[in-house]
Amino acid sequence: MKTEKSQEGIDNRMLEKFYVSMMNTNCYLYYDEDSKEAMVIDIGDTSEQLLEFIKENELKVKYIYLTHCHFDHISGAEWLKENVGGEIVILEAEKENLKDINVNLSEIVSGKSVSFEPDKVVFEGDELLIGNDTFKVIYTPGHTAGGSCLYNGDILFAGDTLFLGTHGRTDLPTSNYSDIIRAIKTKLLTLPDDTIVYPGHGGSTTIGAERELY
């Protein structure tokens, strides 16, 4: 297990990263030390290390957020909910893709069909509260038709939209190259340069560093 703290743990906010699934997906656990409220982002498979950390720190998982429908970002969601609770959340535009094994690629890639309903759907501009921290939902189609990111002022959970030095694939079901470039340019690169980007795979970066590539 590898862990990271968001900007060394500013105030009472903490961030841990766990690698999950056959695709080595970054699964993030964001939590507030005072309230113990937590949000898990993109749990692509079961993770006993994540579960142990949540229980040892007595965290209360409020949301299990899925940035998009691909199996390596969703396959552990129901398992985590069964063990620690929390609402499974996804953008409304991605709800149907979550249930479609041909779009979420679960059967063709992993050999295991994954299909389920979310507990809650959100729309662009909606906000999720963890402790005193507010996360804004940003609709970023392109990698999938209903992809999204979460932004709270100094960090961005980018899913598979924006990576260190590149962007998400656009050769998969419902993906579109023009859409992802437009979303990055008009919705993400407008954020402050010092915004830390935590992607679905690979290392972190900043908006300022990625702006130079576009």
Please provide the spans of the model-predicted regions.
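A generic "binding-loop/recognition-motif" signal
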Residues: 23, 46, 70, 94, ...
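Active-site neighborhood of phospho(di)ester-bond hydrolases with catalytic His/Asp-centered motifs
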Residues: 40-41, 62-69, 88-91, 139-142, ...
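Metallo-beta-lactamase
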Residues: 104-105, 127, 134-214
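Conserved beta-strand hairpin/beta-sheet module of binuclear metal-dependent hydrolase folds
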Residues: 6-57, 149-159
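Hydrophobic residues at beta-strand termini and immediately following loops
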Residues: 18, 122, 140
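Active-site HxH/HxHxD metal-binding segment of metal-dependent hydrolases
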Residues: 45-129, 213
